[in-house]
UniProtKB/Swiss-Prot annotation:
It comes from Oryza sativa subsp. japonica (Rice). The lineage of its organism: Eukaryota, Viridiplantae, Streptophyta, Embryophyta, Tracheophyta. It is found in: Cell membrane; Secreted, Cell wall. One of its GO terms (molecular function) is metal ion binding. This is Protein CADMIUM TOLERANCE 2. The gene is CDT2. The chain crosses the membrane at residues 24-40.
Length: 55
């Protein structure tokens, strides 16, 4: 039997960028806003994504 492939780490910014490319700006902004809502804080990474997701 073969071992499964190693897990690839994706940064939060990479994940938001991927969502923007796949689903569009509105989806990426909502995804970012909901992430901040779920963790009950606004992190610097979230602000960077919100500022850059529509560029």
């Amino acid at each position: 039997m073969y071992n499964p492939p190693a897990q690839q780490d994706m940064s939060y910014y990479d994940h938001c960028t991927k969502r923007h490319e796949e689903k569009g700006c509105l989806y990426a902004c909502i995804f970012t806003a909901l992430c901040c809502f779920c963790c009950y804080e606004t992190c610097e990474c979230c602000l960077d994504c919100l500022c850059c997701c529509c560029n």
